[in-house]
Amino acid sequence: MHYTRISPALVPSLSPTAAAESSGGGTMIATVFMALLLPCVGMCIVFLIYLFLLWCSTRRRIERLRFAEPVKPVTGKGLSVLELEKIPKLTGRELAVIARSTECAVCLEDIESGQSTRLVPGCNHGFHQLCADTWLSNHTVCPVCRAELAPNLPQCNENQSPC
């Protein structure tokens, strides 16, 4: 094999603009443009999807609230001292038999057998006497079930059992 040497004068030279086009200068601008444009478009699409999901969940929550059963409002100023005295008083031992509960729902402490308690008429929920008096002096509903207290509370003597 015999290689011939080609002189540079025999090879046609390219013009500077043709050399730039053949080296990929135009495609470099397109590559940079796409590298910047595609992430921006992608982030915009993700943001729009986020806004759509947020709108859907808010609309669903509003629909649920519109058709939900209204919460019983706690209104009224509470019971007077005379009305509180009409509510049956029991010992903790008697309350455990009647209400089958040994925890005061107001203070969340256990009711001891010798402690003075009150039994809410109607729903038979029991509480420490001080807790029940404090609650019922500000509210006219049971703190557990929100049942309204009977308008005519039963009259109890010291000798009578509330049962």
Curated annotation (Swiss-Prot):
Q: According to its UniProt record, where is this protein located?
A: Membrane
**Which pathway, per its entry?**
Protein modification; protein ubiquitination
Q: What is its EC number?
A: 2.3.2.27
Task: List, alphabetically, the Pfam families matched.
Answer: zf-RING_2
Top EC class of this enzyme:
transferase
**Keywords of this protein's UniProt record, alphabetized?**
Membrane, Metal-binding, Transferase, Transmembrane, Transmembrane helix, Ubl conjugation pathway, Zinc, Zinc-finger
Q: Which PROSITE patterns match?
A: ZF_RING_2
List GO BP terms, alphabetically: cellular response to hypoxia; protein ubiquitination
Disulphide bridges: none
Its main subcellular localisation, reduced to a broad class, is: membrane
GO CC terms on record?
A: membrane
Task: Indicate the transmembrane segments per the record.
Answer: 35-55
Q: Which GO terms describe its molecular function?
A: ubiquitin-protein transferase activity; zinc ion binding
Give a yes or no for keyword Secreted in this entry: no
Q: Where are the RING-type-classified zinc fingers?
A: 104-146
Membrane topology of the entry: Single-pass membrane protein
Task: Give the source's domain of life in one word.
Answer: Eukaryota
| Catalyzed chemical reaction(s) | S-ubiquitinyl-[E2 ubiquitin-conjugating enzyme]-L-cysteine + [acceptor protein]-L-lysine = [E2 ubiquitin-conjugating enzyme]-L-cysteine + N(6)-ubiquitinyl-[acceptor protein]-L-lysine
- Describe the family membership recorded for this protein in Swiss-Prot or TrEMBL: Belongs to the RING-type zinc finger family. ATL subfamily.
Role played: E3 ubiquitin-protein ligase able to catalyze polyubiquitination with ubiquitin-conjugating enzyme E2 UBC8, UBC10, UBC11, UBC28 and UBC29 in vitro.
Name of protein: E3 ubiquitin-protein ligase ATL23
